[in-house]
Amino acid sequence: MCNDTATPQLEELVTTVANQLMTVDAATSAEVSQRVLAYLVEQLGVDVSFLRHNDRDRRATRLVAEWPPRLNIPDPDPLRLIYFADADPVFALCEHAKEPLVFRPEPATEDYQRLIEEARGVPVTSAAAVPLVSGEITTGLLGFIKFGDRKWHEAELNALMTIATLFAQVQARVAAEARLRYLADHDDLTGLHNRRALLQHLDQRLAPGQPGPVAALFLDLDRLKAINDYLGHAAGDQFIHVFAQRIGDALVGESLIARLGGDEFVLIPASPMSADAAQPLAERLRDQLKDHVAIGGEVLTRTVSIGVASGTPGQHTPSDLLRRADQAALAAKHAGGDSVAIFTADMSVSGELRNDIELHLRRGIESDALRLVYLPEVDLRTGDIVGTEALVRWQHPTRGLLAPGCFIPVAESINLAGELDRWVLRRACNEFSEWQSAGLGHDALLRINVSAGQLVTGGFVDFVADTIGQHGLDASSVCLEITENVVVQDLHTARATLARLKEVGVHIAIDDFGTGYSAISLLQTLPIDTLKIDKTFVRQLGTNTSDLVIVRGIMTLAEGFQLDVVAEGVETEAAARILLDQRCYRAQGFLFSRPVPGEAMRHMLSARRLPPTCIPATDPALS
């Protein structure tokens, strides 16, 4: 490939590399990069190729991949990490390069030639260095070495610039994915793990066969509200930040610390221990966390109430353990605070509600005591109602109308979730069919949630197809929503079930996107249509920069995989405007409407759009 003009061979070279890099993620980046380098060595007739990334914080360039792999690498490896401040003139030029650089044997490159000779044992080389550029920043280097002299033609360098751009895109995508994963598992204020990471950790620790018991310490700051009221929420946040640091400083070993939100923290000791064995640790924490904290010129002291509980692997769930520890912390707080309490059976009064639900739920399904309400989905640009999500409520015989969070987890634990799902699907399709028969909602999408068990239950796909057909609905007007965690429980079966559902014609959405453990990899393999951004990333848009980063990352992923996006939990005009700026046009949330009964939803569909007062002002360019 030595012509000065673009050739079909060079075009094929770029296309082949683009195809190989298209689906690269963090897990496959190194392997695929090395494979591409090997291909480029063969096609360009050079001896060595390498990929380096710039570390701007350290002002250094780091070796990411090379071909062929070197044998007998010196220790330390002179090529692994090179600081630009100490680099030879050739590498120094690459820190900010924006165009390809060619180096041939000449006096000006003697230092570079010496470095290559030390690493490769070759005295004379010709090289091309092609920068990876993102925006105005040089983020890395794609390099090629020919032992001996070689002329580099303009057409080759242009093709390599295109390939370097592809590598820069992979670099940015992998970095965004890593950042997204970090933000999804960490608390933005303290840097501690968040609830999602805590539950994942407890899932592993409480799995059958793991060593136990597993202790949990639930820490609840006493009277933090007084700091917020007196000094403001910024001071309260600063106090929480210092408090979190002190928890870490007080511990020895690899214990996991998580912030659940507000003034609540959970500590899981790394070693197995009973609640009684964990009590001395809790008391030591209580004493050490009393130290004075200087905030805004004020010297503050706050005590902490700590609840201690333990769970047995294979017998208790993360929810069981955290509920017990929470109940114990509540008992410590009710005792006046600044104390430690160990969970006892007497604290489990809330378990009565669960027993009550287990007793009455099956009868509630059979006796038609369930109710459907609907949450409208709107187009943020116009206010048009473009969909509705069916949500179930239960008219309990003694406790009144219960939200799904009160009884769906119980339904799943006693194998009633499937029966509950089928009731919701039948009732929602029936009501939606009635609306369409009245000339309403023909352009709207009916969204229905699917529980974990359904995707691995035989006959579910046939039931969906039969139900939709019996009510005369177009399958494309129905969207089934699943969560990421539902899928990863049995990925193989879930993937097969979703593929069959797509054959039926229904849409598939990943609900609560961003809160699971395998979000990125799922997008490559599952037949889905839509991502629903979890409300925890939407509610504070406009005040929480970390949430904005996550939303941007999700929008980028959706665009890359050609998926629709719906934002959940839109409660403020600021959040709606930010979503519009990010080109997320479909949304649900209390800003537009709370869940409403079927008759009210019918009236909304008849009106076709929300009142103008419910829709944020938009940029005409986004309409």
UniProtKB/Swiss-Prot annotation:
GO terms for molecular function: cyclic-guanylate-specific phosphodiesterase activity; diguanylate cyclase activity. Residues 354-609 form the EAL domain. Pfam families: EAL (PF00563), GAF_2 (PF13185), GGDEF (PF00990). One of its GO terms (cellular component) is plasma membrane. Residues 212-345 form the GGDEF domain. This is Uncharacterized protein Rv1354c. One of its GO terms (biological process) is cyclic nucleotide catabolic process. InterPro entries: Cyclic-di-GMP_PDE-like, EAL_dom, EAL_sf, GAF, GAF-like_dom_sf, GGDEF_dom, Nucleotide_cyclase, Rev_trsase/Diguanyl_cyclase. Residues 28-171 form the GAF domain. It comes from Mycobacterium tuberculosis (strain ATCC 25618 / H37Rv). PROSITE patterns: EAL (PS50883), GGDEF (PS50887).
